[in-house]
Amino acid sequence: MRISTVDRRQQLIDAAIRVIRRDGVESASLRTIASEAKASLAAVHVCFTNKDELMQAAAAELLQQLVRSIPRVVDGSEDVRAIAHRVMDLFWAQMVSDELNILAQFEIGIWAKRNPHHGDLSRTVYSDYEKEISKLLVAAAKRQKQTIAARNVARALIVIMDGCSLQYFADPSDPRHKDLCDNLVDAYLDRVGL
């Protein structure tokens, strides 16, 4: 049975994510990804120009998996502070329940930074994440008749997430990480008057 290019492309992206989660970016050769997807190497080259393009698609998919879950946990009546905490709670819950997914995102970002011709990948991923969080913050601010610098608040939340997640990965058994994360969010929101 023939598989459409669109379906094959998604299979390869999903296979790339599985390989990266299991073995890391350095082990994610096109041959390994093709094998994981039960596809030929030729099929990979039909769908993607090179490994860089496939890694970019995998990074975008990982981001979308995280972003798609955000609106489902947001109540339409919450204020900016509550939304900020809900976003952080969601991220934290996903990180704790699926550490490999978050590690894969970090690893793809680091891989992109080490490959100069793909340095924009991390910028694109973070920008997309900022946009999605900003939409939620803007909606909450409008309900409260507030004006906020939503992109700045979203960026700050992402910075806090990244720092706290690195601390968590250094010692997952330390129970203080989540409290520290919540305190950092509150301190930032207090500082900017939210």
From Swiss-Prot:
Molecular-function annotations in GO: DNA-binding transcription factor activity; transcription cis-regulatory region binding
InterPro entries tied to this protein: Homeodomain-like_sf (IPR009057), HTH-type_TetR-like_transc_reg (IPR050109), HTH_TetR (IPR001647), Tet_transcr_reg_TetR-rel_C_sf (IPR036271)
Domain HTH tetR-type residue range list: 6-66
Keyword Transcription regulation: yes
Keywords carried by this UniProt record: DNA-binding, Plasmid, Repressor, Transcription, Transcription regulation
DNA-binding region: 29-48
Stored Pfam families: TetR_N
UniProt keyword annotation of Kinase present: no
UniProt induction comment: Constitutively expressed.
Regulation: 6-hydroxy-D-nicotine and 6-hydroxy-L-nicotine prevent HdnoR from binding to the IR1 DNA. Both 6-hydroxy-nicotine enantiomers prevent DNA-protein complex formation at micromolar concentrations, with the D-enantiomer being twice as potent as the L-enantiomer. A thousand-fold higher L-nicotine concentration is required to elicit a similar effect.
PANTHER family for the chain: HTH-TYPE TRANSCRIPTIONAL REGULATOR BETI, HTH-TYPE TRANSCRIPTIONAL REGULATOR RUTR
Quaternary structure and interacting proteins, as annotated: Homodimer.
Entry function: Represses expression of the 6-hydroxy-D-nicotine oxidase (6-hdno). Acts by binding to a gene operator site consisting of two inverted repeats, IR1 (covering the 6-hdno promoter region) and IR2 (situated upstream from the 6-hdno promoter). Binding to one site may stimulate binding of the protein to the second site.
Name of the protein in question: HTH-type nicotine-responsive transcriptional repressor HdnoR
Species of provenance: Paenarthrobacter nicotinovorans
Gene for this chain: hdnoR
